[in-house]
Regions:
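Sec-dependent bacterial lipoprotein signal peptides
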Residues: 1-17
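Short, well-ordered, aromatic-rich surface patches in folded extracellular/luminal domains
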Residues: 3, 19-44, 50, 94-162
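A short, structured loop/turn motif at beta-sheet edges
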Residues: 54-58, 84-92, 124-129
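Hydrophobic/aromatic beta-strand elements that line small-molecule binding cavities or substrate pockets
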Residues: 50-54, 80-83, 120
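A short-motif feature that recognizes glycine-rich, charge-decorated loops
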Residues: 63-104
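Short, flexible N-terminal segments of the mature chain
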Residues: 50-69
C-alpha cells in the first residue's frame, strides 16, 4: 500500500516538473518560441495591417495586409513572407523591451467603448501585450521593429504552401 502511494507521488511529481519545462521545438530541436512578434490590426483609415513572428531559431514569418509600405519603408506584396534572421539583432530588441519593463506590463490595454482604433499586440519572449487604448507608449519600439522588418530579405510564400 505504501509503495503504491509512493509510486503515485513520484509519478505526480514527474508530471508537474515536466509541465513547466514544455517548450515548442522544431525538428532540429531548437526553440521556436516567439522571440519578437508584432501584430497590427485595421482601422477605418490607412493603418498598416500585418503580423510578424520572429522565432528563437531564426525563422521569421510576416503576414502582410494593407497599407504597410510606409511602416516598412518598402513595398511588400500582400500575403505571407518568410525569412531567416539574425537572432542576435532581434535579441537586442527583446533586451530593449525588457529594459523598458515590458514584462511588467498588463496583457491588455483597451476600452471597448472606443471605436475605430487599431490595436498593436507586441510579443517579447512569449509575453504578449495588446495595446489599443490607454496603454503605455510603445511607438518607438514598434518603429524600431518595423525598420528592421523593412531591411530583412523576405521571400513571398506561394499560396498553396500557406
Amino acid at each position: 500500500m505504501i509503495r503504491g502511494r509512493l509510486l503515485c507521488v513520484f509519478v505526480a511529481a514527474g508530471c508537474l516538473m515536466s509541465c513547466g519545462a514544455s517548450q515548442e521545438t522544431t525538428s532540429s530541436g531548437t526553440s521556436s518560441v516567439v522571440l519578437v512578434g508584432l501584430e497590427k490590426t485595421p482601422c477605418h483609415g490607412r493603418c498598416p495591417v500585418y503580423s510578424l513572428r520572429v522565432h528563437g531559431d531564426g525563422k521569421a514569418t510576416l503576414d502582410v495586409g494593407r497599407f504597410c509600405d510606409e511602416a516598412f519603408g518598402r513595398s511588400l506584396s500582400q500575403g505571407r513572407h518568410t525569412a531567416q534572421v539574425d537572432v542576435g539583432v532581434w535579441g537586442l530588441v527583446a533586451d530593449e523591451a525588457h529594459a523598458m519593463g515590458f514584462d511588467t506590463l498588463a496583457q491588455r490595454y483597451d476600452d471597448p467603448r472606443v471605436v475605430d482604433l487599431p490595436s498593436a499586440t507586441l510579443t517579447i519572449d512569449g509575453h504578449s501585450v495588446m495595446n489599443r487604448y490607454g496603454g503605455p507608449n510603445l511607438n518607438e519600439l514598434y518603429t524600431r521593429i518595423e525598420r528592421l522588418v523593412g531591411r530583412m530579405n523576405w521571400q513571398a510564400t506561394p499560396e498553396d504552401s500557406r
